[in-house]
A protein has these predicted regions:
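Nuclease-adjacent, charged terminal/linker segments that flank catalytic cores
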Residues: 1-77, 81
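Active-site metal-binding core of divalent-cation-utilizing nuclease and nuclease-like domains
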Residues: 70-99
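A short acidic (Asp/Glu
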Residues: 115-117, 163, 189-200
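Polybasic (Lys/Arg-rich)
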Residues: 184, 193-247
Length: 247
């Protein structure tokens, strides 16, 4: 993938993607970030954008494939608002809707391998508004305050905020919430990629152990693992994603 103009793969509705990003916080297309050879937004927008007009073709992620519910809608760059008006609210790279679940997706490409993460969580997240069975997520929130450098590769604070946004959406919609962490492992990510990939996966496992069993279900999957699930016409799209973005 080379820099310059934003890349839109065949079958990805460019006008719709541009419209969505034009409304979103940061507008990565207008800012030029989308055209970067290492753009995370370009990977997410192309990977999920193909399903905007054909959501039923979107496969569920391997860790939650047992949901076996048909996908009814796919959105990209979607804001999930907290139960208050002011302040910042989480933006997820994609949201997948079924008749029973709302599945928020946080996609990562090079970010986990670019410097250590320091967690910061405002006092606003202490409000008792998240509903039942959120103890694990609240425990992670508190843990990150006492150990803000617990994770080097994983942006755990961002995931906590996303989970709280999904909990709020679940309270509104009545759908069961799932947060999927979809990560790439680009071979040019750093000087010792295999070592970094292993460390990243271990951090994911540690995080998962703390938040598992809660109302917002957490699952993690590699981009390559998800692309391997594409079937029929989508297999050509999966091939194009792999060849263009090497996730």
């Amino acid at each position: 993938m080379s820099g310059g103009q934003p890349i839109f793969l065949p079958g990805v509705p460019e006008d719709k993607v541009r419209e969505v990003y034009g409304r979103a916080a940061g507008n990565e297309i207008a800012s030029g970030k989308f055209a970067s050879p290492q753009s995370s937004a370009a990977l997410a927008a192309n990977g999920f954008g193909w399903f905007l007009d054909r959501p039923s073709d979107c496969p569920l992620f391997p860790p939650i494939a047992d949901l076996s519910a048909p996908v009814r809608a796919v959105e990209i760059e979607r804001e999930l608002r907290f139960p208050w008006s002011g302040g910042r609210h989480p933006w997820l790279d994609a949201v997948v809707w079924t008749d029973t679940h709302v599945i928020g997706v946080e996609s990562k490409r090079y970010e986990p391998f670019r410097g250590s993460k320091v967690a910061e969580l405002a006092d606003a997240y202490d409000r008792d508004v998240w509903g039942e069975a959120m103890q694990g997520w609240c425990a992670m929130r508190d843990l990150l305050r006492t150990e803000p450098r617990r994770y080097k590769h994983l942006d755990a604070a961002q995931l906590v905020k996303h989970a709280l946004g999904l909990a709020t959406e679940s309270n509104r919609s009545g759908l069961s919430p799932v947060l999927v962490y979809l990560y790439a492992e680009p071979q040019d990510a750093c000087r010792s990629p295999q070592e970094a990939f292993l460390a990243h996966r271990r951090e994911i496992e540690d995080f998962h152990a703390i938040v598992s069993g809660n109302r917002v279900h957490f699952a993690a999957c590699s981009w390559r693992g998800w692309l391997a699930c594409f079937t029929r016409e989508a297999t050509n799209h999966a091939r194009a994603v792999r060849e263009t973005f090497a996730p």
